[in-house]
């Protein structure tokens, strides 16, 4: 398959050298006295050298996605007798999600765990998996991701130099606000709501009457503190673990979108490895996906207890019809090219989906 590679400037190459040379002192990556060879698209692999791959992750070390990434690295290390080591950098050490996607594309980082909201520029069809109020529940979403359709999307960016290794879940996204409760779509009018750095998500929130403000996840709490935004939208475990309830104590469980995540890898780096090593990495990634799903379920239970303890005001819409009506124009703007795919997704949800 023909690859479309983008040239890398000297600054990016220099950054890659620095990343390779700097060892992680926080215990996040493998520490070994033996020689470790870094693989990148412009660095040939030494036949007998060990290989260091870098994986970027924006979550804190105790987040389910982070623990799953660590598990992935552990499996690869064990199954290659320590010959291939994946060093995981948590807490946005290597940049925010949007930055790390580009770095994986360029080859200055080998892997990243990212929301697919940041991948639609590589394949617009990924929007079909993110449409508002599409899934009945989490089980419905996982049936889609584990189907042939999900496999197709993991492979859909290969011509852009990126391979999706596996899926991670990220729950359902809900609104939370600092000044007033959200009981209906009308309550969102003119509220400044933080969204992911995605034009699609800006349109989703904009059609619901709010003023979307795109910003990195790491900046949300400070913006809530200084009044730069009136609220945000995210899954409730992230809302709890980040402490956003201190500044935004009102949340409505409207579950407007479920946006899966991917562990992605630079395709050219992967192809430098033997077929056996490629298979090992793909299988380990798949097993980390299963582990992440288990961890996420437990994480939801733990973080819900946090919200109960601090007394967050949680509302449940009796009827989501009003919210669904508000986002109908999103389907007109984005869904028409993917009507067959959306129909297939709905069918996987069973009656009423």
Model-based region annotation:
Residues 23-139, 149, 158-353:
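N-terminal secretory/targeting leader peptides
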Residues 18-21:
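C-terminal motif of bacterial Sec signal peptides marking the signal peptidase cleavage site
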Residues 1-9:
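Bacterial N-terminal signal peptides that target proteins for export
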Residues 143-155:
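Signature of the catalytic double-stranded beta-helix
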